[in-house]
Amino acid sequence: MTKSIIREIGPLALNFQDDKVLIFFGDNAPSELREYSIIHDVEVFNQNDFSAGAKLVIGKYVYEIEAVGGEAANNMSKLGHLVVYFTEVPDEILPGAVYAAPHIFPIVSNGEEVLITL
């Protein structure tokens, strides 16, 4: 299981609702990206969780991970960085991306858990 807690929601982080994208970063997010990011504390990390078929839980929302880019687990491990797309999986998957279904943009709040588990 991978577990994090949402600590801060950048003032522009939810501006990507129409594109159905959430950007997560650890507390060390670069200042120019912090305002666009969901800042979270990664409490538990398991690289094996980053695979198609795993569950992604954000607060009360439950998703199935459909595809994972080759750098997503590494980015999460080192930077707390994760980009989640609630869209159809494209032909070319971005290296740091996770694609989740259903394709519904979640409402997020400070203090909520984010879980990834097989």
Segments (PLM) and residue ranges:
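N-terminal disorder-to-order initiation segments that are Gly/Lys/Arg-biased
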Residues: 1-37, 112-113, 118
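Helix-rich interaction surfaces within compact, conserved domain-sized segments
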Residues: 24-25, 88-118
